[in-house]
């Protein structure tokens, strides 16, 4: 049967061309999908097939989910735009279950405007996830509006980021500064400084929450496979999967409390025209298909559940690289307006 978002797309007249690939169960053996710009490189993951299909021009729009970095990272590698609205703004019924409070539904598209149109439609037609508010804002993309302040939130990932990517990111920020946008370092402001300090802990909290919330149905499937091997899953995914679900209730409660505090710190940074920015990945697509790349730049936003967009505004070594912007809870329209302004004003760098 269709997931809620696929059902809504069909009702809206979308032509569903087919299913796309992803790493086994979202975290195991990567799929055979290759990068549309270099077949010897990874498309990223876990929404690898969706990103590759959009990046190759096979489809204008595809859907995916993100628990850690599964939308914006593959979009970065494949030259697509990825829009992850806030957690729960789009119904995720039928997506396979697990990681209930970490998983976000999002859209990959050729343009930011298309990503908005589809995401906004899904939030209304499929509805928000039970207990959550849907996306606010116009059904069509909002008017472009240049951001006022962009805060670099790169502390956790900068030392992991290759020199060419650092140079491309700095050059884009220099261009934005020349256009009148204030560029600030996280350590210059109290709230962003606290966020930057807590990013490593955010990754740990994400892992604990994922482990605890994966007990069903993931662990059930893998225990059945272990008891009576059917060949349904690779040894890699069974071994790694059974290591999940070991988080204790106390550890889970601690991670949830950390997330609440992290969200409060993030919300304290809210200001008109202010957004956080990072590269979408630590470099261009990795060689081979066994490595889907680092999710370091998605740790904070995946834990907090705030809206994020990745725009293919940079290139390194002839390969696309995304520029990621983070907004605030309920601020999808504000984030999209800023993204559209950047996409229009800096299209020359678009891959």
Tell where the protein language model's regions lie, with residue ranges.
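Short connector loops at secondary-structure junctions
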Residues: 182-202
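Charged, often glycine-rich, active-site loop that binds/positions anionic groups
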Residues: 31-39, 196-214
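Acyltransferase
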Residues: 163-188, 219-226, 252-273
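Short helix-loop capping/hinge segments that flank enzyme active sites or metal/cofactor-binding pockets
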Residues: 147, 205-263, 267, 312-322
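Glycine-rich, small-residue loops and helix-cap segments
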Residues: 10-19, 116, 122, 247-351
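Structural signature of FAD isoalloxazine-binding scaffolds in flavoprotein oxidoreductases
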Residues: 72-78
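A short helix-breaking turn/cap at a secondary-structure junction
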Residues: 81-172, 224, 346-351
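Gly/Ser-rich catalytic/binding loops embedded in alpha/beta enzyme cores
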Residues: 1-68, 179, 314
